[in-house]
Every structure is written in structure tokens, then in C-alpha cells.
């Protein structure tokens, strides 16, 4: 996921030598995807993650105390805006991967990255399996290689026929099927409002 996080940031700078990217399940908005979910402070993973960073680099003055920042900046202010990748600046061809299983950490970042990137050539793959199991699955490694071969080696392969969006519809544990779409959110999606009932 850290590789995806850094890709969102670096690619937003549009370095001329960068020809393609594959952000595989990574956040790009620290406030909404890690520190506060729906405005509610995350007191579990966020603290665990930040304390792990501090433990590794105790003498590094560039490491911010994000747990304290979470207390000092409970609203989405300039502090958090500066730590949000400017996704609209991304013009590089991309293959983004999200998972239904990483809700609240990586899937929002991947979906927003795909939607907001200005890239003309972009694809989204959404699976319902375990994060790293999916990343290293033979068929997904082949998908990544096909994408990179097309953009980095200029190979005339089948990548250009890949649907813009491929997503898994889960039926139960390790059972589901894939569908294709022209965009995300899925065109013709019907949203159903849900309301809390006090009873």
C-alpha cells in the first residue's frame, strides 16, 4: 500500500520520465482515509501505524507526530489539505486496483484516485479477495505486466482491449464473478437512501 501512496504523490508532479503507474490499493487523503472516517477519529489502526513509524525512526526530525496532529486538527483544515495528494494533476496512464475488503483504508483512496486523475488512459480493477493474495496472484501479475509492457516497451499486446473497469461481485467466501463497466462509479447505479430508525 505504501507503494501506491507514494505513487499518487509522485505522479501528481508529472515527472516527464514517468510513463505509467499501478497504484495497488493505497490511500491519498490522510484525513478521510486514516485519521478520521466520516469525521470520527480512528483510534485503532491510525495510532498503531503512527507508533510503528516512530519506533523505526526515533531520531528522524522529519517524522511528524500524527497522533498529536489528529488531536490538534479534528477538522479538515490546511494541515490536512497539505497532506492530500492533488489527484487532478495526474496525467500518467494508470491501472488502479481497489478491494472491497479494505474498506476505510485503501478502497476510498483508489476509487478517488481513479475518479479524480486527469489521465486520459486509466483503468480500474476491483476485487473482493485478500489484498496481497490478489496482488501476487498469477493472473494479476500477468495483468500488471501486460499494462507495463504496453506503456513502457510499446508492445502491441491485448492491453488496449482491456475494459475500463473490471469489478468483482461477491456471492460468498471465495465465490463471485467479474463484471465490466465503462466508468466508475458504475453507470446507471441506483442509490438507495437508508435511514436510522430509533426503534
PLM features: what roles do these ranges have?
Residues 2, 28-30, 101-103, 131-132:
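Solvent-exposed loop/turn segments at secondary-structure junctions
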Residues 16-19, 72-79, 83, 88-92, ...:
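Alpha/beta-hydrolase-fold serine-hydrolase catalytic core, especially in secreted/extracellular enzymes
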Residues 11, 114-115:
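N-terminal cationic-hydrophobic initiation segments that often serve targeting/anchoring roles
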Residues 8, 111-112:
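Active-site phosphate/pyrophosphate- and oxyanion-stabilizing loops and adjacent acidic/basic residues
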Residues 2, 48-49, 195-197:
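Short, Φ-rich (hydrophobic/aromatic) sequence segments
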Residues 1-9:
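Glycine-rich nucleophile elbow surrounding the catalytic serine of serine-hydrolase chemistry
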Residues 9-89:
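Accessory cap/linker subdomain of secreted extracellular hydrolases
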Amino acid at each position: 500500500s505504501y507503494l501506491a501512496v507514494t505513487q499518487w504523490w509522485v505522479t501528481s508532479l508529472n515527472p516527464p520520465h514517468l510513463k505509467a503507474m499501478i497504484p495497488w490499493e493505497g490511500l491519498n487523503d490522510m484525513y478521510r482515509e486514516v485519521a478520521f472516517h466520516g469525521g470520527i477519529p480512528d483510534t485503532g489502526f491510525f495510532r498503531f501505524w503512527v507508533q510503528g513509524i516512530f519506533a523505526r525512526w526515533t531520531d528522524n526530525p522529519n517524522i511528524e507526530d500524527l497522533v498529536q496532529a489528529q488531536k490538534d486538527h479534528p477538522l479538515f483544515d490546511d494541515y490536512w489539505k497539505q497532506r492530500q495528494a492533488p489527484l487532478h494533476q495526474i496525467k500518467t496512464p494508470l491501472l488502479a486496483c481497489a478491494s472491497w475488503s479494505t474498506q476505510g483504508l485503501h478502497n476510498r483512496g483508489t476509487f478517488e484516485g481513479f475518479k479524480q486523475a486527469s489521465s486520459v488512459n486509466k483503468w480500474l480493477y476491483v476485487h473482493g479477495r485478500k489484498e496481497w493474495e490478489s496482488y501476487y496472484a498469477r493472473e494479476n501479475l500477468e495483468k500488471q505486466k501486460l499494462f507495463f509492457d504496453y506503456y513502457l516497451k510499446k508492445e502491441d499486446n491485448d492491453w488496449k482491449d482491456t475494459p475500463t473497469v473490471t469489478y468483482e461481485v461477491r456471492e460468498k467466501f471465495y465465490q463471485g464473478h467479474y463484471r465490466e463497466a465503462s466508468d466508475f462509479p458504475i453507470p446507471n447505479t441506483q442509490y438507495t437512501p437508508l435511514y436510522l430508525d430509533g426503534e
